[in-house]
């Protein structure tokens, strides 16, 4: 019953039809293993971000359709994934589909490095070794791995990169 109530609430708040709201709720609940009794956090998260950023709940939901499973696979939460989508949408004003696809690609590449650090990953058609990515990030003071050699959470790495973004130039 909670899921139905939250889905109806999402449809009303986001201006979505019931089918789209059901799909949006199902994607989030399944990908992030949210209990049915906790489904309200999906509506609350999307609504709070829509109020704070120049993005609608339906845009977040649409981008989440592309991104949710990849994000959950690298340990991201509903909240952090939604926040990344919101900031990217506000900053670029790209469509939800484009934001979802872009974030999914970035997250998937990180997941590939985490799963097989010795293998090459495809970056814009070029095969790149993990150590090149690691070296590039280390040159600006960011480590992909923690002190024990384990991969850090994706959102922690990205937040650290974001904090240094304005200091980067074409030579960095």
Where are the regions that the model predicts?
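Amphipathic alpha-helical interface segments used for oligomerization, scaffolding
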Residues: 1-172
């Amino acid at each position: 019953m909670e899921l139905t109530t939250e889905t109806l609430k999402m449809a009303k708040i986001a201006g979505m039809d019931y089918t789209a709201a059901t799909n949006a709720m199902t994607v989030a609940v399944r990908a992030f293993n949210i209990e049915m009794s906790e489904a309200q956090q999906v509506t609350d998260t999307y609504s709070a971000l829509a109020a704070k950023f120049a993005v609608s709940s339906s845009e977040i939901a649409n981008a989440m359709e592309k991104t949710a499973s990849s994000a959950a696979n690298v340990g991201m939460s509903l909240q952090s994934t939604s926040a990344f989508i919101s900031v990217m949408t506000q900053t670029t004003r790209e469509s939800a589909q484009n934001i979802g696809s872009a974030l999914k690609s970035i997250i998937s590449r990180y997941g590939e490095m985490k799963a097989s650090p010795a293998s090459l990953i495809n970056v814009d058609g070029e095969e790149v070794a993990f150590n090149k990515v690691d070296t590039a990030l280390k040159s600006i003071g960011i480590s992909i791995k923690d002190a024990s050699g384990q991969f850090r959470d994706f959102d922690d790495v990205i937040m650290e990169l974001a904090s240094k973004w304005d200091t980067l130039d074409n030579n960095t």
